[in-house]
Every structure is written in C-alpha cells, then in structure tokens.
C-alpha cells in the first residue's frame, strides 16, 4: 500500500465505511487509547510508537483503519527483504468481527509484497482464537510456539505467510506527516 493508496470497505447496513490509510503522527492519541484498552499489560509507550514512525518509510509502514473519521484499528509491518514481520495489529473491541482486522492485515501483506518480501511473519497469543482464525483464513501457517512468551501459561504461536513474488519497483511511500 503506497502513501497514496486508500482502501475502502463498504459498511454493513446502517454502518459507516471503513477506510484504511497511512497512520500519521496526529493519530497517536487515539492509537494510544486503543493500545492501552486492548493490551493493558504490554501496551506500547508513546516513545515506542514515535520510534516506529521515525523509521517510516525506510523499513516500517503503519496503517490506520477509520470509521466515521475515528481510528478503530491500526497495524504495522517491518520489512527487511526477503522477510517482513507484523509489528502490531489491533482493532477496537466494538469493531472486531466487522472485517477491520482483515483489511489491516491485507494492507500489510500488500506493503510487504510491494517492497519485495517473500515471507511475512507474525506472532499471536495461542489463546486468541478469533485472531488465529483470521490469520489462518488468510493463509498463514503455524511454524512454532514460544512457551510463556506473554507471561506464565500464555504462549505465542509463530506464523508465516509465503508471498508471491511482487514488484519491488513499487513507489516508495513519502515521509510527509510521519
């Protein structure tokens, strides 16, 4: 997904369209609110988000999902050809099950592929069946397990998706607003 790309997903009846586009620094207040609500024990700090955004577009790319102008999800990818790694993906509780996670993940897959990655890795808590189901439905396969990665009794599953050869000649995203 280049800086000029915007993905739109039609809304369910009575809802608002979902728009996925570049995460900007001015989105961070909403992102940090979501981060704290969704990951209270391991939330990224403002400094961690700023550090990640400072690496856009060289090796990182972050997107936000919006409904009605409000951030309802965000995701990021780290690309070092020939591999890429999902750094984070999060969807507001009220927006889960509405295709938001799928739209965010699709944007990361497109970005990784456009930058020449051949495989996309991620880790997911083993006790998150909805997330695991999403990843499997998009072709990710379990490669391994990290015991107690998220704390005692909370394992991480390591997953990967083989990417078809993409164009590494895709336009590089601009740094405006990073």
Describe the predicted segments one by one.
Residues 30, 133-134:
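Well-formed, non-transmembrane alpha-helical positions, independent of function
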Residues 105, 128-131, 148-153:
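Short glycine/proline-centered loop/turn elements that form peptide/ligand docking sites
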Residues 98:
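Flexible nucleotide-binding loop
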Residues 3-6, 15-18, 22-94, 102-111, ...:
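Acetyl-CoA-dependent GNAT
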Residues 121-123, 136, 141-158:
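Conserved catalytic-core motifs of GNAT/GCN5-like acyltransferases
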Residues 39, 49, 74, 134, ...:
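Conserved hydrophobic/aromatic "anchor" residues
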């Amino acid at each position: 997904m280049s800086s000029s790309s915007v993905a739109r997903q039609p809304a369910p009846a009575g809802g608002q369209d979902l728009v996925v586009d570049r995460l900007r620094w001015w989105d961070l207040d909403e992102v940090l609110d979501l981060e704290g609500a969704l990951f209270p024990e391991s939330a990224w700090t403002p400094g961690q988000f700023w550090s990640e955004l400072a690496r856009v577009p060289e090796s990182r790319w972050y997107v936000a999902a919006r409904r009605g102008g409000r951030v309802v999800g965000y995701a990021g990818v780290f690309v070092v050809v020939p591999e890429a790694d999902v750094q984070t993906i999060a969807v507001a509780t009220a927006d889960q099950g509405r295709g938001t996670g799928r739209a965010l993940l699709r944007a990361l897959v497109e970005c990784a592929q456009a930058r020449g990655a051949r495989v996309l890795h991620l880790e997911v808590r083993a006790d998150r069946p909805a997330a695991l189901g999403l990843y499997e439905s998009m072709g990710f396969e379990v490669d391994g397990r990290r015991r107690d990665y998220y704390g005692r009794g909370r394992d991480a599953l390591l997953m990967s998706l083989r990417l078809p050869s993409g164009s590494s000649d895709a336009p590089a995203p601009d740094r405006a607003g990073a």
